[in-house]
Amino acid sequence: MKVLVTGVEGYLGVLLAAVLMERGHEVVGLDTGFYRDGWLYNTDMARFVSCINMDIRHITEETLQGYDAVVHLAELSNDPLGQLRPKITYDINHMGTVTLVNKCKLVGIERFVYTSSCSVYGVGAESYQTEASAPHPQTAYAKCKVLVERDLAAMADDDFSPTFLRNATAYGPSPRMRFDLVLNNLAALAWTTGEIKMTSDGTPWRPLVHVLDICEAIACTLEAPREVIHNEIFNVGDTRENYQVKEIAQIVAETFPGCQLT
């Protein structure tokens, strides 16, 4: 399968590309290149057939010719960034994605994997959130996820199959590291300062999922029979990896010798 991965130079994208290539897929990347410098460790980006330097809002039908599937990761990627400039978040994350999908349909791309988020559930009243739970997005980032799911679902037809993966909070190493994610952030503090200072009571829950497990979920979605994934939503995570923030902090502090938790 020939796959276009948008946001390929990001935290998830660079790992996903390697996973897909290892499974025999032909991968082409697309990225703005804003964060091209500052790799945490070396990786062989030269293995890409090509990496297109482009904003998704400017992508053309010509650029999209010849792909079997698109995995869309290229968005403004967290709540604080989304709240800083909500209009830009909507322009890129919502309208940029819808425009991209319209062009995908025009050129005959049959599969589109959209990386949504568990943040669409907001503060849930139920003990656990399932794919059938009603979304209650609290931020511009989460609201855009819900809008994209709604609009893309309406575009599904016999020739176009979108799939929505609501990922839990990612953790784990990547050449393009993110330290704004809760577990990664606490591990960075433990390593660099030897101390984790709790700034709240730590009672909020965080569903976690390893970044490579997200990659595997995406790969399995691409390879699954069409009737299984057509216009479906899947939570990507494991109930056993739901933790309160204070529990995550305790585990991290115990993992790094000499780290103090205050």
Language-model features: where?
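Conserved beta-loop-beta element that borders a ligand/cofactor-binding pocket
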Residues: 116-117, 149-174, 184
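Active-site Tyr-X1-5-Lys
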Residues: 123, 138-163, 191-192
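Short-chain dehydrogenase/reductase
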Residues: 90, 138-146, 180-181, 207-208
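C-terminal substrate-binding subdomain of Rossmann-fold SDR/epimerase-dehydratase oxidoreductases
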Residues: 194, 199-262
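Conserved Rossmann-fold NAD(P)-dependent oxidoreductase catalytic core, especially the SDR/UDP-sugar
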Residues: 98-140
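Short alpha-helix in the Rossmann-fold core of NAD(P)-dependent oxidoreductases
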Residues: 75, 85, 92-97, 113-116, ...
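N-terminal Rossmann/SDR dinucleotide-binding element
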Residues: 1-69
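NAD(P)H-binding glycine-rich loop region in Rossmannoid oxidoreductase-like domains
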Residues: 56-92
